[in-house]
UniProtKB/Swiss-Prot annotation:
This is Catalase-peroxidase. There is a cross-link at residues 244-270 (Tryptophyl-tyrosyl-methioninium (Tyr-Met) (with W-90)). GO terms for cellular component: cytosol. It comes from Pseudomonas putida (strain ATCC 700007 / DSM 6899 / JCM 31910 / BCRC 17059 / LMG 24140 / F1). GO terms for molecular function: catalase activity; heme binding; metal ion binding. Residues 1-21, 195-227, 365-387 are annotated as: Disordered. SUPFAM superfamilies: Heme-dependent peroxidases (SSF48113). The gene is katG. InterPro entries: Catalase_peroxidase, Haem_peroxidase, Haem_peroxidase_sf, Peroxidases_AS, Peroxidases_heam-ligand_BS.
Amino acid sequence: MSNESKCPFHQTAGGGTTNRDWWPDQLNLRILHQHSSKSSPDPDFDYAKAFKSLDFQALKKDLTALMTDSQDWWPADFGHYGPLFIRMAWHSAGTYRIGDGRGGAGSGQQRFAPLNSWPDNVSLDKARRLLWPIKQKYGNKISWADLIVLTGNVALESMGFKTFGFSGGRADVWEPDEDVYWGSEKVWLGGDTRYGKDQVKAQPPGQGDLVAEPAKHGEEQNRDLSAERNLENPLAAVQMGLIYVNPEGPEGNPDPVASGKDIRETFGRMAMNDEETVALIAGGHAFGKTHGAGPADNVGPEPEAAGLEMQGLGWHNTFGSGKGGDTITSGLEVTWTSTPTRWSNEYLNNLFDFEWELTKSPAGAHQWRPKEGKGAGTVPDAHDPGKKHAPSMLTSDLALRFDPIYAPIARRFKDNPEQLADAFARAWYKLIHRDMGPLARYLGPEMPNEELLWQDPLPKADPSTISEQDIATLKSRILASGLSVGELVSTAWASASTFRGSDKRGGANGARLRLAPQKDWAANQGVDKVLAALEKIRGEFNNGGKKVSLADLIVLAGTAAVEKAAKDAGYSGSVGFRPGRVDASQEQTDVESFAVLEPLADGFRNFTKARYSVKAEKLLLDKAQLLTLTAPELTVLIGGLRVLGANHGGSNLGVFTDKPGTLSNDFFRNLLDMSVEWKPTSADNETFEGRDRKTGQVKWSGSRVDLVFGSHAQLRALSEVYGSSDGGDKFVRDFVAAWQKVMELDRFDLK
């Protein structure tokens, strides 16, 4: 008999075949409950308060000292960790994409899977370990999210570059994001499903969510493999596990012009225009090198697949010493300039002054060297002072020279170094702050004074806000305006629900509902009538000497309507309202930047702009997650908005009540009524009729979004709470709380 004791358990908790295995297409509500207080070691911790007590200059001094404090266990290239830390910060922020606002540096996700194990992030595990003594020293006064980005900024400064500034305020989370769709490929560096006829056009929430742009939706369904590359939305990388593009060229094909197209697509999806893109590449590649000392088969598994003894590190390298001059990261062995630890314009000089020929790295990857042996002996070795090299380039570098749009920009920067320095400083600042939201969230002594259009600026608030008496007066005028409860509620929702918790953009503050592009969105059809009436009320009120913003008035109108609807249902009490919103101007609103906030579907209003391959209930879940809602909040809001008559275009889908405009729990009571039998009324199962089982008479009509609250087991369980005989009071209380939450999602000035 074996001496090894037999374990009484064949499987531990959480193992075995899961519901997801049985029903992979099941609506996954887990994405609404990620990052709960239960995952945090200190649920009541106030990071902004802690950050304000940080000795910021002392931290920067320690970071600067670290740059040249080379460690034997991971020696610094050229004796300076700056380039490594720039890459760390870049790859943290560079996961951001404008399509859904997800990704980015805002919560320190680079510490967790899958990002900590992406092929493009090889060796960044070492970068974060180099930072640990400093993180340990300053503790919770600096988050990992802020520290990663700040270290990249300090790295630039330590090598002679003047940055545009830095702002803190990125609080850490304690578990991986589950809502981000990184692609459908099953192998690292795969790109088979994000391009071509076999492209997966939608993923259920929990595996990530995809909402294809309507303009491209038909192309995505009908194109074949030979068609022009059309990257799946909302992805902003060409292969699984890359930040942007394959540096060897598309699919490893060393074609600089084709690479330029990939660069434009991916950087554009990260909100960078052509000039910003050139500046970022030219500025970033002024420093450091890539690593491809030997074949990739010398590299061990990534951190998430490595053994316990690796203690969270990965990619153990058996080539030579496995570090220093034997490092293998991308497989490319490129050093761009003779001054890899000092800011200069040499990258662009080399790019245009040399003619380039294709070669291969020691690892066998495509890269470029100067023709005729030019430049030999001008570039230092990263670890051996006795060696010299020629400069080298990536295929993606040559794109800046041969792409017809990038080339003139790059030449201008080459001839005007001061323009490159300014453009890189601004683009870098945008890169590392793009997902932080409004300026009210920015912290620290290095916040620039200049407001930038991509920050969605707002005018300063008037410190003299309207009084409680003013609020009561305005409510009375709104309710006497002739506008219905449904119209007022729907308009307030249209304004506030543009908010995205992913990148903290959108929301009611600014009243951009009245500006381009929002005023022309299909989802906002009919709000112009409400806005005109509210503008009249506002003008009359403001003529009396006091001032109310339209942004406040839009929210107040919805709030007054909810109060009236609750009162009509027999419930007393008020709905919270806190003034202080301001009205943005069209000049403060970047139309192109705001276009990505347009709702292609909003299940809360039973709206879809077009027919999509992804199911309506999954689009609803995606929207709810971006609104930071829990499953109970999602449920109660749907039930309340339906009976209030807030549907797009006044549709009766899901209005399961004979007294619309009254805040009752009728939606749930009638949805759960077993005397009603439901059947689809459309071939695509998008709409349904509910008929009396005995008489066959049609009682209700509903959408997929409505019926999922009776079909999905978890949502039905929640619906039963609100649909019970004693659920009315709770329904109203919970609806009011969820309503106020959505109305104030962007009020960072209050938090």
